[in-house]
Amino acid sequence: MLTDITLGQYYPGNSFLHRMDPRAKIICTMIFITAIFIAESFWSYLLVTAFLLMTISVSGVPIKLIVKAIKPLWFILVFTFIIHLFTTPGTTLFYAGIIHITREGIIRGTYMTLRLVYLIALSSLLTYTTSPIVLTDGIEALLTPWKRFGVPAHELAMMMSIALRFIPTLLEETDRIMKAQASRGADFTTGNLMHRAKSMIPVLVPLFISAFRRADELATAMEARCYRGGEGRTKMHQLQYTGRDSIGFAAVVAVTALLIGMRMMS
């Protein structure tokens, strides 16, 4: 399960998406996420699905990596579907005691589950096609106009970058500790939920110690390199908008406009 969590991992490549400006990718992702919540009909969801599959194809990221990113959240997806299945009023398809399944419940549950799948796929695509350093530069550039209002743009971007970088590291550390505990007879797979939660305590304690140790080592390394924040810092590669960014914007805006049109006509 831990090896299936891919948040923060970068997939090297030279695709159209890899070469887009990180600012453009972040903005396009935010616009497309908004477009997902505009979708309400079968045809609008079909359009979103087709555009997302086309984006994945253009990115060069294997579809199995997107599926791998979705797998750890299967419980949330199933729970979302069940909640809407049993709580949405409408045309009754099945009724037995407290179980009341409606046609609208099935449709609503499917749509809400698809929205979550789309959100996971989009966030995964962003991190797969953008290295942590480039993503940090993009976030910092987008936050820079807010510095006049006292927003610490560089510090926030650096925190996000470190957090994304540490996720795979901590997952690897967790997996290593669990294997070490299992070799000593620990069981993490059997028993009820409470038993499994208690069995994780021997994992959490060394994990927290390891996390604090790594954080201290990182702070020491940054101080040794005279890190003093973003003031006066220069970058090896300057961010620059290109024609491919305009194409990306145009495609996302066009799909969003179509979804708004479908919503207004439905």
Feature locations, PLM:
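Loop-to-transmembrane-helix entry motif
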Residues: 69-73, 77, 113, 117, ...
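Transmembrane alpha-helix interface motif
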Residues: 1-44, 48-57, 141-151, 155-158, ...
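Transmembrane helix-loop junctions in multipass membrane proteins, especially transporters and channels
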Residues: 41, 45, 60-64, 88-96, ...
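Membrane-helix interfacial "entry" motifs
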Residues: 14, 37, 60-65, 96, ...
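Juxtamembrane/interface alpha-helical elements of multi-pass membrane proteins
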Residues: 73-186
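Alpha-helical transmembrane segments and their helix-start/interface "positive-inside/aromatic belt" motifs
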Residues: 25, 64-74, 248
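Alpha-helical transmembrane segments and their membrane-interface exit regions
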Residues: 51-61, 76-79
